[in-house]
Curated annotation (Swiss-Prot):
This is tRNA(Met) cytidine acetate ligase. The gene is tmcAL. One of its GO terms (molecular function) is tRNA binding. HAMAP family: TmcAL (MF_01539). It comes from Mycoplasmopsis pulmonis (strain UAB CTIP). SUPFAM superfamilies: Nucleotidylyl transferase. Pfam families: HIGH_NTase1.
Amino acid sequence: MAIAIIAEYNPFHNGHIYQINYVKEKFPGEKIHIILSGNYVQRGEIAIASFEKRKKIALEYGADYVHELEFEYASQAAHIFAKGALAKINSLQIDKLIFGSETNDINEFINIAKIIKDNKSQYQLFLKENLKKGLSFPKASSLASQKITGKYFQMPNDILGFEYVKQIIFNNYKITAFCHTRTNDYKSDKPSGKYASSTLIRKMIFEGKDVSKYTPMIFEKKPIRIEDLYFDFQTIIFNKTAQELRQFKLVSEGIENLFKKHINEKSYDDFVAKVNSKRYTSSRIKRIILYILLGIKN
């Protein structure tokens, strides 16, 4: 018998230690498997530490096994990220999954997923209608779910957790899902005792501040950020035609022309802000930038 945790550990911090200890207490004797993103994470960024370094510290703090989630899933939107993670958990014959959640109501996740499954054709119709209106996929999906069930999830870990549960329900996986309350808001700019969000810890690391109160990971020098590669990205965009850019993964619907139009922006953040729109979320733009830098094509 085993239980899985899906994680990025970007970086591994006290909240993750709490989660592993919580699992050990609630599920004694169960082997803990971590499904961990590799060197790149879901938002299209470079992980703050290598996969091997994050794997090592997870094992040191109580995980029994760490499995790498393939790049093609780890660097994608929530529904694709969840698809890859749950397929891996199922292939490993792990029978339980646990995740952090803002609402912490697993029965609601399951019930809503079942309603959507029973009304899948109607859901797909609403989804297509919303996409035609120019909405991003996450927004279009949320509104389609809301129209069918009367409910939708707004908080990031609820959204991701719901995608996990949907994969279990839609694929009839023999996996039982559990959730628990998070120790801290994922992007809070304020710590709570010994806990701080991954976003805040990364910010502190890049500012050269001491983070030892919040994470056991040691950072002797500032990690490379995707922002540091903006000049390389600019060079590629300048040297490629719009037609050539369309060969890269996720580049479609004219986004290559927006990239060409705004490539003179002075910084990575300025560029993302200019290209960001109702249809193109900042997360999607960041993933495309990563794919272009890595040469990932369709």
